[in-house]
């Protein structure tokens, strides 16, 4: 570094602390860059300090006359040192000693001064380090508290001077990371040549002139006198007010300053040994926080490298950075405090590797200790083992068998010691010989009875022990042929089951080593493999225990083989990708791909590299699918391993349930980790995540994350990551890289999965810190320095991780595992012992860190199992240190655990505690409630059931205890109280408060819901009880509204999603409480639990406007999904009948509430609020799909609304079409595209049913409307909706019963009769369509929809016959159409031209029917749709296209020219050109035009079946060969925020008049007072809802028994939706207020931060704070988890939620032709679609998409199962590109289906507001 040799004045200023009493003061000097300090001078009073200063600043003011000044400096050469170095002391005397010179030049960026002065004028001389040349990659984490305290410049760039408050008011709370300011290059001021100065300093003239400017340059470091008067002291009181203390309530403890100074004197330069006094730490925290409020542009005293690294760091953003600790904390949000990319995992300390055996661990421990360290236990064991081996060289009698039984206990310590000490002696070989002899049946037969069995059992146990010796032991056993010997024993006659179980245990331990497994699976030519022999054994007649034990071994073999196959595929991918440049080997590959995340790379380069990779990678789609399945299987096997892979205890019996029995079996995971390790699993996963082709595949990505998440849930899994630390570092980089990519692309991906990368990183880092703590305790003795710098560094890192919610949950999770919390408790106990005799502990920074971290764990971790072992010691610590605020708060959290054992009999005490504290819910006093509920969950709620698991009946006992302790009533009251607290802030759109407030709310809600779910499931499962306490559904509906309606981010995060799932599950338990054995009457139906629950939910929807949306979501979540289910395998008839019966039961119970349902449809039908429109459509479709009565009920209601609307105008006037008509028709249109709704409409408009004649009339009115569209916009809209409805009605694929190929043409006619309008209607519809074509006023969209509809009809004789009849009546229609196409042709209207020509080709002849415009080839049509027999010939078509003025040929010629002209710019028009030329030639060669023949025979359709029959025989599932993303997608399109209609109806309203009329008795003043100033009352038992005579009754009042319990109602979800894959769960996409565009806009990150609209709202209403006085910070971005499936068959239900992002859906391939075909699965109108944005303008969004597309091949099936047929027919798109009135560029981009939702890819619609 270049150092300027001239000495300059670096700093000159006066620090004042006016105070009555004299005390020690601390001040800090900061430099904007690194300086070299040569000299420090204290300027005595009255002496001029510098000639270049104005008089008011030029003179010294130091007082008193003498004092000692201690100086400390920040050593920039030790950037991560947690403390300041000591510079030295000056014994100041104004007459003799004013100059201090350090022993050597010191380079630093700051000084700390401490001394007993009231006023100090200080000059610092030295030189500036001109070059900053550090280029470290990663900055050190901010250091933990330094000993010398250091106030800093605050808000107004002034250093507040401390006043005379006693400084011993500080307590060592950990510091907060400081905000960094920009660095400025230094420009040092010159020194002044004052006559007082004994040294003459070089001064140059030009520098002298520079004085003012340069003095200014350093000015910010000293107090700025102009901005703030000198009196703005840096006082202790000030600090207490300004400083956001850690968690808000740190008590300040006494500090003995003198003692601390003495110690400082003793040890001037040792960083570590200066006791880290509380005050410094607390002060620093204060300064940092104040700095956060107003940074002066310079960073805190710290290493100069940090600034550089900060700039590099800014590219990384946490997905949701909310640092919300306590009220004061909000003032100081730390910047990038803890860069996770900065820290990598290091080799594992303290803990042992999870896949090593006890023997291997013992050997490595002995090696580490060294051979000289005596280990008495090992020596004794080795001596005894040697004696036994020597004693019985030959003897094989009873004593030898006894020796065999003793040996296993000596192997771990004894054999390990022998192998290390005495390498010559082959003890292992001798033991293997003995083992083989012990297992030898011949030797056993020679033993007396009983001894022979003992010998064989001892032999098997010895195998198990020797297999534990790792590779050497297993290798020797295998060479001795142990597998064959064990099989001999298993296959031998008359061997008891218990002996076979022992043999299996031995075999299991052999294959638990990879060498053993390899040998077991290997077969030679002349003998079978162990696997084959084991299968043969199981297939013999064996007892159930033996089969169970054998199956466990088979499962292990399967797992091993799956891993081998994954490794093979991974190696294959690695080889293939290495062909790409820079990808020569897997590791390089990983790095190269990770590198590419660097924004410096050009996008083109990235794209081309990816393409290279894709092209060169020969991994097929099939192999990727296989890889996905293998990874999913790995996850499944690991999840079920404890129940399927362990050897059963000898004394247990595999029953379905158990009450008591042996404790849980062995732990299977070490073996699985060994297999994973030997197959380099983490390296393979990293490779998969680093290669575009696999990392972009949702299946692979999701399956990988599932496995990694599962591993990270347990201590052993995390240790596995740590033991493979190099692979884990790369893996986390790869995961974070994927997340970063999505951030760059603006993808709205699933928050939970994004956060998973960070969560995994934080979890492993936390565990690493814990290992460092434990190993520190191992190394250090009690006498060593307590606040060791390493220890503080570790604790500080842990503390920094807790600053973001993901990190906080990770810390809580890891500390709650195993005995990890002991690391903090050890620290706290050590200091509290010290505290007995002295005050060190209260000053110890480490102690305070430990207290804070323990408190964070208690608050955020729901894993309370660890509290069982630690609660007593923690409570003791809290009692011991009553001055520590953190510990006192912890004491409140742990209050319910006093003298508590986590057993079933603690339930009454805990419930009693909850009852007593219910009024303190969500207050500081009531935090123990959360813990009590968590413990209750732990004790009383069974874990989710896993396949193969025995049911433990202790959970039933726990539920009985809950009921007897009045648990039901208590939990309902908890929910009611929680609702009353949350309602007010929610109404004002205040979020949930700080992190702590939010964690508490979520935790309390989840625990209470879990407990209620457990109790109700157990109670209602058999149908023998009814539960009529309607407080439960009522409280749940409110809770759902408060926590799960619409978050600001537009989607639920994982916690909210789980709460929603729990609420749905609890409400669904009410459907179980129906006893099928009882006779069902209207009365019993209306009063059973199911109906009462439904009534509560339905009535809540319309109760208050704030509950509209939430109520609709809730209802949609409860209803079954529409059929058919999509699946890859045939569903059993029994399951199908369950699915249909469930829907009938729902229909019956809903029919009782018909009035409510009609009211809901009527109320919302006219809404302009799009999310509510969307939800209403969704619910109507679900209701119609249940059964015919509900379908008719809903469709009647909708049609009645249309009838009322159209008939409301008086007779003589022309009908007025309003926007309300438009909305009603839009609703009908959306519903008509769904099978059940369409058939109900057809049923009603036929007019055959008495009383429904009005619907037939209104249908005719609608047809008349289409014929005369008129020119008003509203009327045009209505016409377009009606044509779209006609299209749905004429589509024979929208049908309940899908045709099966095996049933032939007869079934085709039936299909048509059941899915198309009757003859009379069809005639009217065809006439209407042709009249529309002939009408010159028809809009472009109408024409396109009509042509498409005619194409549907032309597919079969029935439709074509009616079309021909209409063409005879309206012969000019096709000519008008062609003329219109030619006259308006442009690139944008190409779609209409293409469709029209396709239609003409289609009707020309039967064999050309399959031809499509985009490929102009003939297509064979197979299966369900028989060839059409009827057609037109070319001459007839020519006649139809002719007019007096011009011939068809001339029109085609003109069209050809136009297309040719446009196709130069647009290649996509080429196929249209071919079409035009082909038709022109056909017509030219056809000869003279002929009139249409009327010889056709009218096809007669059979009478349609009744609606009820159609529902009974409907297709229940659709088969697909691959469960692709389209099938996995949610059944309904997510609502898109982009579809907001800007022309919403505006209605004039006089609000004052309205309020006087409706709310005359409303007292606004008192209401506001009640809302803002009063506490919500507790829902005690005295306040009951009207209608419930609760009084003092318990919940039993509402439980009645019908005495029969055999029947178990299958009324759960009877539909299967596989667990969705993919990253998104997605959002309704809009904020709380649906049409508030400002709210929907994300904050713009491309400009300096401005306030978001919700921040303004929050600012206006900031008096409203959550109950414990914590002001709401900025709402964190949400994290979320993938939704679990909602299938009834899988037994696993998740919510599908109303918030789904686009990426659930498979994006259909772009159309090759001029317009897309109908994409998706034929016959399934639930497949959704994503079309690229930007090509078209669609304003009628939010409805279901049901485009169809290329279809999988057929298979013969029963009538209930349907496999789609490949009819790539003519264009099947739905309607136009959106109504013409809304579309500026109608026609561009091709029709993308009927209701195209905006947004392509995953949730990219966000961009419309941000870019």
Curated annotation (Swiss-Prot):
The modification Phosphotyrosine is found at residue 913. Pfam families: VIR_N. The modification Phosphoserine is found at residues 133, 138, 173, 222, 1578. Residues 139-152, 174-190 have a biased composition (Pro residues). The lineage of its organism: Eukaryota, Metazoa, Chordata, Craniata, Vertebrata. Residues 224-233, 1722-1747 have a biased composition (Polar residues). This is Protein virilizer homolog. Component of the WMM complex, a N6-methyltransferase complex composed of a catalytic subcomplex, named MAC, and of an associated subcomplex, named MACOM. The MAC subcomplex is composed of METTL3 and METTL14. The MACOM subcomplex is composed of WTAP, ZC3H13, CBLL1/HAKAI, VIRMA, and, in some cases of RBM15 (RBM15 or RBM15B). Interacts with WTAP. Also a component of a MACOM-like complex, named WTAP complex, composed of WTAP, ZC3H13, CBLL1, VIRMA, RBM15, BCLAF1 and THRAP3. Interacts with NUDT21 and CPSF6. The gene is Virma. It is found in: Nucleus speckle; Nucleus, Nucleoplasm; Cytoplasm. Residues 160-169 have a biased composition (Basic and acidic residues). Keywords: Acetylation, Cytoplasm, Developmental protein, Methylation, mRNA processing, mRNA splicing, Nucleus, Phosphoprotein. Residues 1802-1811 have a biased composition (Basic residues). Belongs to the vir family. It comes from Mus musculus. Residues 1688-1697, 1787-1801 have a biased composition (Gly residues).
């Amino acid at each position: 570094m270049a150092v300027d040799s001239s000495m300059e004045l670096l700093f000159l200023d006066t620090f004042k602390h006016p105070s009555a009493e004299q005390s020690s003061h601390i001040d800090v000097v900061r430099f904007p860059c690194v300086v070299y300090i040569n000299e420090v001078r204290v300027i005595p009073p009255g002496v001029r300090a510098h000639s270049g200063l104005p008089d008011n600043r030029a003179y010294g003011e130091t007082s008193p006359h003498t004092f000692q000044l201690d100086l400390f400096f920040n050593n920039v050469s030790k950037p991560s040192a947690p403390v300041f170095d000591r510079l030295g002391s000056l014994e100041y005397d104004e007459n003799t000693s004013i100059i201090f010179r350090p022993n050597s030049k010191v380079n630093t960026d700051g000084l700390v001064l401490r001394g007993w002065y009231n006023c100090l004028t200080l000059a610092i001389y030295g030189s500036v380090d001109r070059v900053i040349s550090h280029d470290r990659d990663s900055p050190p984490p901010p250091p933990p508290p330094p000993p010398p305290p250091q106030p800093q410049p605050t808000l107004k760039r002034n250093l507040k001077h401390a006043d005379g408050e006693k400084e011993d008011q500080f307590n060592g709370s950990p510091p907060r990371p400081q905000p960094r300011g920009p660095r400025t290059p230094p420009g040092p001021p010159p020194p002044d040549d004052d006559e007082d100065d004994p040294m003459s300093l070089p001064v140059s003239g030009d520098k002298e002139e520079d004085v003012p400017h340069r003095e200014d340059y350093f000015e910010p470091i000293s107090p700025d006198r102009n901005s703030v008067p000198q009196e703005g002291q840096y006082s202790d009181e000030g600090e207490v007010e300004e400083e956001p203390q850690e968690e808000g309530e740190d008590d300040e403890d006494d500090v003995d300053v003198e003692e601390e100074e003495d110690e400082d004197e003793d040890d001037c330069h040792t960083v570590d040994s200066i006791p880290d006094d509380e005050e410094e730490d607390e002060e620093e925290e204060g300064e940092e926080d104040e700095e956060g409020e107003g940074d002066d542009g310079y960073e805190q005293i710290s290493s100069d490298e940090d600034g550089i690294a900060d700039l590099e760091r800014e590219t990384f953003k946490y997905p949701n950075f909310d640092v919300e600790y306590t009220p004061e904390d909000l003032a100081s949000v730390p910047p990038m405090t803890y860069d996770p990319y900065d820290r990598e995992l290091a080799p594992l300390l303290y803990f042992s590797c999870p896949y090593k055996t006890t023997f291997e661990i013992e050997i490595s421990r002995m090696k580490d200790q060294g051979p000289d360290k005596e280990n008495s236990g090992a020596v004794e064991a080795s001596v005894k083992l040697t004696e036994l081996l020597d004693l019985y060289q030959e003897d094989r009698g009873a004593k030898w068998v006894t020796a065999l039984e003793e040996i296993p206990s000596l192997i771990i310590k004894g054999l390990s010691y022998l192998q290390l000490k005495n390498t010559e002696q082959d003890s292992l070989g001798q033991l293997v010989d003995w083992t083989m002899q012990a297992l030898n049946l011949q030797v056993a037969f020679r033993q007396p009875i009983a001894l022979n069995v003992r010998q064989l059992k001892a032999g098997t146990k010895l195998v198990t022990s020797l297999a534990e010796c790792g590779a050497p032991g297993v290798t020797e056993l295998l060479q001795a042929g142990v597998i064959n010997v064990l099989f001999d024993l298993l296959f031998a006659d008359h061997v008891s089951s218990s002996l076979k179980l022992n043999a299996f245990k031995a075999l299991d331990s052999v294959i638990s080593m990879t060498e053993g497994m390899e040998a077991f699976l290997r077969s030679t030519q002349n003998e079978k493999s162990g696997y084959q022999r084991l299968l043969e054994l199981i297939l013999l007649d064996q007892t159930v225990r033996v089969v169970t034990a054998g199956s466990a071994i088979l499962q292990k073999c399967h797992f091993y083989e799956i891993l081998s196959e994954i490794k093979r595929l991974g190696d294959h991918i690695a080889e293939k990708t290495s062909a790409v440049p820079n990808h020569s080997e897997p590791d390089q590959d990983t790095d190269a791909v990770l590198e590419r995340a660097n924004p410096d790379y050009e996008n083109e380069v990235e794209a081309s590299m990816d393409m290279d990779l894709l092209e060169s990678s020969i991994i097929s789609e099939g192999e990727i699918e296989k890889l996905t399945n293998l990874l999913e299987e790995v996850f499944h096997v690991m999840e079920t391993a404890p129940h399927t892979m362990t050897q059963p205890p000898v004394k247990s019996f595999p029953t379905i349930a158990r009450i008591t029995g042996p404790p849980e079996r062995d732990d299977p995971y070490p073996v699985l980790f060994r297999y994973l390790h030997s197959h380099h699993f983490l390296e393979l996963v990293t490779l998969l995540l680093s290669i575009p082709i696999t990392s972009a595949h949702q299946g692979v990505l999701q399956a990988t994350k599932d496995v990694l998440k599962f591993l990270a849930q347990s201590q052993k899994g995390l240790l596995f990551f740590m033991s493979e630390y190099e692979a884990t570092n790369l893996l986390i980089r790869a995961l974070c890289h994927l997340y970063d990519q999505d951030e760059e692309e603006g993808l709205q991906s699933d928050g939970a999965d994004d956060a998973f990368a960070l969560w995994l990183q934080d979890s492993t880092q936390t565990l690493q810190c814990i290992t460092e703590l434990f190993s520190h305790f191992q190394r250090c003795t009690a006498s060593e320095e307590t606040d060791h710098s390493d220890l503080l560094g570790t604790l500080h890192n842990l503390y920094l991780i807790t600053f973001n919610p993901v990190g906080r949950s990770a810390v809580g999770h890891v500390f709650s595992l195993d005995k990890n919390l002991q690391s903090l408790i050890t620290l706290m106990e050590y200091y509290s012992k010290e505290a007995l005799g002295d005050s060190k502990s209260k000053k110890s920074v480490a102690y305070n860190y430990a207290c804070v971290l323990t408190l964070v764990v208690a608050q955020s971790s729901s894993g309370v199992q660890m509290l069982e072992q630690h609660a007593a010691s923690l409570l003791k610590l809290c009692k011991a240190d009553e001055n520590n605020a953190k510990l006192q708060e912890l004491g409140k959290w742990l209050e319910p655990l006093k003298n508590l054992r986590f057993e079933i009999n603690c339930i009454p005490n805990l419930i009693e505690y909850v009852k007593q504290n219910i009024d303190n819910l969500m207050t500081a006093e009531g935090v123990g409630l959360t813990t009590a509920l968590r413990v209750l969950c732990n004790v009383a709620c069974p874990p989710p059931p896993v396949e193969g698991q025995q049911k433990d009946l202790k959970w039933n006992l726990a539920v009985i205890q809950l009921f007897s302790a009045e648990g039901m009533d208590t939990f309902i009251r908890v929910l009611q109280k929680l609702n009353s607290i949350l309602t007010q802030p929610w109404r004002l759109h205040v979020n949930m408060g700080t992190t702590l407030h939010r964690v508490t709310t979520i935790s309390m809600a989840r625990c209470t819901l879990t407990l209620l779910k457990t109790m109700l499931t157990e109670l209602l499962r058999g149908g023998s009880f009814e539960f009529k306490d309607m407080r439960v559904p009522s409280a749940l509906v409110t809770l759902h509204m408060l926590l799960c309606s619409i978050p600001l981010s537009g989607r639920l995060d994982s916690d909210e999603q789980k709460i929603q799932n729990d609420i749905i599950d609890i409400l669904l338990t009410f459907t179980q409480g129906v006893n099928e054995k009882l006779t069902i009457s209207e009365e019993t139906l209306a009063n059973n639990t199911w109906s009462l629950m439904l009534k509560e939910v339905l009535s809540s929807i319309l109760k208050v406007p704030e509950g509209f949306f939430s109520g609709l979501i809730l209802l949609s979540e409860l209803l079954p999904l529409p059929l058919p289910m999509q699946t890859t395998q045939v569903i059993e008839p029994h399951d199908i009948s369950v699915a249909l019966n469930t829907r009938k039961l729902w229909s019956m119970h809903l029919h009782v509430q018909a009035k409510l349902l009609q009211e809901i449809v009527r109320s919302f039908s006219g809404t302009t609020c799009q999310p509510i429109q969307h939800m209403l459509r969704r619910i109507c479709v679900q209701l119609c799909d249940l059964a015919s009565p509900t379908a008719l009920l809903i469709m009647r209601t909708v049609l009645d609304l249309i009838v009322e609307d159209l008939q409301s105008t008086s007779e003589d006037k022309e009908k007025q079409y309003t926007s309300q008509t438009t909305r009603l028709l839009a609703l009908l249109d959306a519903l008509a595209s769904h099978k059940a709704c369409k058939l109900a409409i057809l049923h009603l408009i036929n007019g055959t049913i008495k009383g429904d004649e009005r619907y037939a009339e209104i249908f005719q009115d609608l047809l008349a409307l289409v014929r005369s569209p008129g020119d008003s916009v509203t009327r045009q809209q209505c016409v377009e909706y009606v044509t779209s409805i006609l299209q749905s009605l004429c589509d024979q694929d929208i049908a309940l019963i899908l045709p099966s190929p095996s049933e032939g043409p007869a079934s085709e006619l039936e299909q048509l009769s059941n899915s198309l309008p009757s003859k009379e209607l069809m005639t009217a519809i065809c006439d209407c369509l042709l009249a529309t074509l002939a009408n010159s006023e028809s809009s472009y969209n109408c024409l396109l929809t009509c042509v498409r509809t005619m194409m549907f009809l032309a597919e079969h004789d029935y439709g074509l016959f009616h079309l021909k009849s209409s063409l005879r009546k309206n012969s000019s229609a096709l000519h008008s159409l062609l003329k219109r196409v030619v006259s308006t042709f442009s690139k944008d209207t190409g779609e209409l031209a293409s469709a029209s020509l396709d239609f003409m080709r289609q009707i020309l002849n039967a064999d050309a029917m399959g031809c499509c415009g985009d490929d102009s080839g003939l297509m064979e049509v197979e299966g369900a749709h028989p060839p059409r027999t009827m057609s037109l010939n070319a001459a007839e078509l020519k006649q139809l296209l002719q007019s007096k003025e011009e011939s068809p040929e001339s029109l085609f010629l003109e069209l050809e020219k136009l297309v040719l002209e446009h196709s130069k710019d647009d290649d996509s028009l080429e196929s249209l050109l071919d079409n035009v030329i082909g038709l022109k030639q056909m017509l030219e060669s056809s000869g003279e035009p002929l009139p249409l023949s009327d010889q056709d025979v009218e096809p007669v359709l059979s009478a349609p079946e009744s609606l009820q029959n159609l529902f009974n025989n409907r297709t229940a599932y659709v088969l697909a060969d691959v469960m692709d993303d389209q099938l996995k997608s949610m059944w309904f399109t997510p609502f898109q925020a982009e579809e907001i209609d800007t022309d919403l109806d505006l209605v004039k309203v006089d609000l004052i008049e309205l309020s006087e009329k409706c709310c005359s008795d409303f007292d606004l003043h008192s209401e506001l007072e009640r809302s803002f100033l009063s506490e919500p009352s507790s829902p005690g038992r005295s306040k009951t809802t009207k209608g419930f005579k609760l009084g003092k009754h318990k919940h039993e009042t509402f439980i009645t028994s019908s005495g029969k319990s055999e029947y178990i109602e299958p009324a759960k979800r009877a539909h299967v939706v596989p667990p969705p894959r993919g990253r998104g769960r997605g959002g309704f996409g809009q904020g709380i207020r649906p049409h508030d565009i400002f709210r929907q806009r994300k904050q713009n990150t491309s400009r300096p931060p401005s306030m978001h609209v919700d921040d303004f709202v929050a600012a206006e209403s900031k008096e409203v704070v959550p109950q414990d006085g914590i002001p709401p910070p900025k709402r964190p971005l949400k994290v979320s988890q993938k939704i679990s499936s909602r299938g009834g068959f899988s037994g696993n239900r998740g919510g599908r939620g109303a918030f789904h992002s686009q990426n659930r859906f498979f994006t259909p391939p772009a159309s090759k032709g001029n317009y897309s075909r109908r994409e998706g699965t034929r016959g399934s109108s639930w497949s959704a679609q994503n079309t690229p944005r930007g090509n078209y303008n669609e304003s009628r969004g939010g409805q279901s998409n049901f485009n169809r597309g290329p279809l999988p091949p057929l298979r013969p099936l029963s009538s209930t199962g349907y496999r789609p047929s490949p009819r790539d027919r003519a264009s099947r798109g739905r309607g136009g590109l959106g109504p013409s009135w809304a579309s500026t560029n109608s026609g561009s981009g091709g029709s993308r289906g009927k209701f195209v939702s905006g947004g392509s890819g995953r949730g990219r619609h966000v961009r419309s507001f941000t870019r």
